């Protein structure tokens, strides 16, 4: 077991370790929060001894889908607010994202290898963290009186079965999809061009290869090219589902592109291939019927991922179909798309307000297995689980964040606000927050027209950050 420092909290008393199962986004963040609070942690990760269908490394917090954490705007966007709340709460994931950041307009995107390496190095170097490699193939032993299960969308079959038997509830499953990655130098820039939608610049100090406001590579399509592409998507050979994967619903936030196309021929043109906010410098007077965007995937700018192009097409079909896109005729793929299954528990039915299993409170769940959707949301639930477990170990009552914060709104959703009979994965959004009081404008009137929506969003976010600071303050004072 790792040696740990004597702190004001522990005085000279030994503190039993908390066991964290899974070193993904949630588990890594939970372990960090515990260790930073002065609580020893045993972090269990089955990779590389037991592999998954989606992971490629044995690193912690490996990103297996997109490399984007979505919008970083903490004034007008709910996930951007969640970023900021996590930063203020001392998040390791947000620290790593700042180090590994790559250009992505107003989004927070990272070099996935640099990100994972940073998280792995920080945790393995922490004196209060012990890493144990190997599968936990059943429920945690009875002498683990405080354990966090953060095994994510690819929970091993053995552990998943044990959880199902314990909860007595049917697990739900769906698929997250992986988008292809293209080598930058194989893209024909005489056809494509660099531009962020509406020329929006990166939120940080980074800029894409094309310069400020030019973080994406855009591939234009005529109507004829778009319709031919849709036909190719619909008729292309797909990887067959295994028997245990059949009848599994998809989550709308990560639908395979061919599934979107099946919903109607115009669906993609009003989704990831929408042509708005972009002007082709090669033909400025010609409006594209549809546009495919590629986003920088690594710090060097040598890899670009196809935005929204998660797919279950067979690999040979992917190269054939995607090379019909103008500018990608000679594209070389660093990685082709694929799908992996995701499982989650019925959290509103099973968990208490501090994420413990009501039936067996020594077990706490965190991350995507709780039914949150997205890297940041998973990490956020890991942050809370770690803080709650640390409070218990240090003899304090866990304090939940205010529901007016992004952390609190998401937590409340999965631990009771959502309808357990129809519970489905959820991203953070302002619809989870209590409605705010929108301040009057300089004329003493309620904002109207175009000013109404941003004023309301700022009311959400300003209230959230003020309430977050009040929630964080007692812990900061206790640490002094």
Curated annotation (Swiss-Prot):
Its domain of life reads Bacteria
Reactions performed catalytically: uridine(54) in tRNA + (6R)-5,10-methylene-5,6,7,8-tetrahydrofolate + NADH + H(+) = 5-methyluridine(54) in tRNA + (6S)-5,6,7,8-tetrahydrofolate + NAD(+); uridine(54) in tRNA + (6R)-5,10-methylene-5,6,7,8-tetrahydrofolate + NADPH + H(+) = 5-methyluridine(54) in tRNA + (6S)-5,6,7,8-tetrahydrofolate + NADP(+)
UniProt keyword annotations, A-Z: Cytoplasm, FAD, Flavoprotein, Methyltransferase, NAD, NADP, Transferase, tRNA processing
GO terms, biological process: tRNA methylation; tRNA wobble uridine modification
Q: What is its EC number?
A: 2.1.1.74
- Please list the cofactors this protein needs: FAD
Where found, per UniProt? Answer: Cytoplasm
**Which GO MF term does the entry hold, naming one?**
tRNA (uracil(54)-C5)-methyltransferase activity, 5,10-methylenetetrahydrofolate-dependent
Q: So where does FAD get bound? A: 22-27
Q: Which InterPro entries match?
A: FAD/NAD-bd_sf (IPR036188), MnmG-rel (IPR002218), MnmG-rel_CS (IPR020595), MnmG_N (IPR040131), TrmFO (IPR004417)
Enumerate the residue ranges of region (Disordered): 438-458
Gene Ontology cellular-component annotations? cytosol
Family the entry assigns: Belongs to the MnmG family. TrmFO subfamily.
Q: HAMAP family of this UniProt entry? A: TrmFO
The record ties this protein, via NCBIfam families, to: gid_trmFO, PRK05335.1
Q: Which PANTHER family match?
A: GLUCOSE INHIBITED DIVISION PROTEIN A, METHYLENETETRAHYDROFOLATE--TRNA-(URACIL-5-)-METHYLTRANSFERASE TRMFO
Q: What does this protein do?
A: Catalyzes the folate-dependent formation of 5-methyl-uridine at position 54 (M-5-U54) in all tRNAs.
Q: What is this protein called?
A: Methylenetetrahydrofolate--tRNA-(uracil-5-)-methyltransferase TrmFO
Q: Whose protein is this, by species? A: Parvibaculum lavamentivorans (strain DS-1 / DSM 13023 / NCIMB 13966)
């Amino acid at each position: 077991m790792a040696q740990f420092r004597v702190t004001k909290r522990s005085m000279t008393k030994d503190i039993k370790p908390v066991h964290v199962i899974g070193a993904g986004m949630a588990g890594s963040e939970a372990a960090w929060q515990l260790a930073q609070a002065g609580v020893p942690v045993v972090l269990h990760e089955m990779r590389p001894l037991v592999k998954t269908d989606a992971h490629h490394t044995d690193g912690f917090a490996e990103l297996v889908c997109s490399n984007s954490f979505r919008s970083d705007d903490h004034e007008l966007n709910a996930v951007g607010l969640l970023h900021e709340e996590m930063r203020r709460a001392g998040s390791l994931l947000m620290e790593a994202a700042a180090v590994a950041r790559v250009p992505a307009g107003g989004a927070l995107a990272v070099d996935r290898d640099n990100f994972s390496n940073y998280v792995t190095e920080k945790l393995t170097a922490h004196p209060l963290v012990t890493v144990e490699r190997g599968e936990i193939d059943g429920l945690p032993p009875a002498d683990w009186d405080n354990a966090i299960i953060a095994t994510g969308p690819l929970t091993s079959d053995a552990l998943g079965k044990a959880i199902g038997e314990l909860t007595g509830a049917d697990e739900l499953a769906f698929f997250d999809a992986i988008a292809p990655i293209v080598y930058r130098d194989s893209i024909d820039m005489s056809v494509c061009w660099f531009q962020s939608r509406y020329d929006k610049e990166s939120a940080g100090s980074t800029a894409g290869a094309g310069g400020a406001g030019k973080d994406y590579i855009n591939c234009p399509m005529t109507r004829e090219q778009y319709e031919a592409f849709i036909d190719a998507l619909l008729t292309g050979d797909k990887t067959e589902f295994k028997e245990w994967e059949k009848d599994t619903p998809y989550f709308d936030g990560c639908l395979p592109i061919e599934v979107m196309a099946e919903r109607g021929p115009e669906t993609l043109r009003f989704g990831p291939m929408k042509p708005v906010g972009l002007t082709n410098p090669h033909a400025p007077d010609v409006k594209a019927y549809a546009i495919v965007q590629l986003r920088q995937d690594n710090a060097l700018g040598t890899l670009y991922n196809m935005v929204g192009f998660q797919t279950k097409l067979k690999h040979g079909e992917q190269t054939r179909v995607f090379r019909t896109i103008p500018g990608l005729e000679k594209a070389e793929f660093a990685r082709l798309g694929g799908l992996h299954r995701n499982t989650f528990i019925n959290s509103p039915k099973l968990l208490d307000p501090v994420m413990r299993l009501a039936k067996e409170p020594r077990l706490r769940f965190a991350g995507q297995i709780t039914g949150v959707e997205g890297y940041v949301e998973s990490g956020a639930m890991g942050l809370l689980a770690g803080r709650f477990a640390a409070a218990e170990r240090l003899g304090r009552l866990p304090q939940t964040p205010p529901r007016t914060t992004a952390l609190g709104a998401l937590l409340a959703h999965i631990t009771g606000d959502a309808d357990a009979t129809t519970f489905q994965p959820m991203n953070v959004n302002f619809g989870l927050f209590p409605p705010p009081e929108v301040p009057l404008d300089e004329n003493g009137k309620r904002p109207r027209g175009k000013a109404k929506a941003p004023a309301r969003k700022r009311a959400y976010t300003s209230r959230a950050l003020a309430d977050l600071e009040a929630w964080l303050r007692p812990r900061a004072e206790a640490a002094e």
